[in-house]
């Protein structure tokens, strides 16, 4: 077994891989952090809203919505992980210990893996629901729980492996350029796994599309509903294109550079674009909320109700504060009924 460099600094591994470790804040670092913080905050707020909507509306207490809730939780975790990265990047990277660096990387790997795996689970559940001709899946809750547990076990496995064994601390010639403490084989496996998930999603949604098209077409042959058939088909095409298109746009660039680095491409300038492609992958956690949740009419109504309730509570508190202030100077009393609209009481 070769010599292991457990006592070396982060700078040692970055120099070994040829990745620059900045000692001061460059304009590029400031831009990346500013964009990253903005995306992270939006991801946190959006997915918190999705989780609150699913928890508060009993109509969403169905297996498919449990999976959507798990997707929101994974994306919320991704927002936290990326926020942690933004506070430990740039010149601060050099001050990290090896354990701190692996924690930073592990949070990202775990959260993004959970998000991607949940996307596949949702696709499989949608296929099962469509084949069973159900609006809401009746998949036993125990199976949904097992599916969610399986997603997180796989995510934690991929996230924790680098810190324990799948690193290059004992084999410097295997270190990657984008993640100087990780083995190139880890990056290649992660990229290929994400690509496999995408191909499986394409296969599942393609099967759903052709199944629904055949079914609606048979119905159209017996009933004069050709315009409705066309509308249903176009709507399904739109849904499939949005789902797969969002995944391709957000994930493909990052998968390509990870795979190139994992395969040891020396002539590929992966370091020039890695931060921006990682930001694009993180933006998928924001896009997921729009694609999988906000397109649901009932979900949108629940969002409006939650936001209106929050605004109403704030308005009520402000009115109550105004009332208590006014009582000191006049005997006029203001009552606030449950509907939140102030009424004047004539007691003088």
From Swiss-Prot:
A motif (PDZ-binding) lies at residues 345-348. SMART domains: 7TM_GPCR_Srsx (SM01381). Keywords: Cell membrane, G-protein coupled receptor, Glycoprotein, Lipoprotein, Membrane, Palmitate, Receptor, Transducer, Transmembrane, Transmembrane helix. It is found in: Cell surface; Cell membrane. Pfam families: 7tm_1. Interacts with SLC9A3R2/NHERF2, MAGI3 and PLCB3. Interacts with RALA and GRK2. The chain crosses the membrane at residues 31-51, 67-87, 105-124, 144-164, 186-206, 240-260, 277-294. This is Lysophosphatidic acid receptor 2. Belongs to the G-protein coupled receptor 1 family. Residues 1-30, 88-104, 165-185, 261-276 are extracellular. Its main location: other. The gene is LPAR2. One of its GO terms (molecular function) is lysophosphatidic acid receptor activity. Receptor for lysophosphatidic acid (LPA), a mediator of diverse cellular activities. Seems to be coupled to the G(i)/G(o), G(12)/G(13), and G(q) families of heteromeric G proteins. Plays a key role in phospholipase C-beta (PLC-beta) signaling pathway. Stimulates phospholipase C (PLC) activity in a manner that is independent of RALA activation. Signal peptide: none annotated. Residues 52-66, 125-143, 207-239, 295-348 are cytoplasmic. One of its GO terms (cellular component) is cell surface. Gene3D superfamilies: Rhodopsin 7-helix transmembrane proteins. It is a multi-pass membrane protein. The keyword Lipid metabolism does not apply.
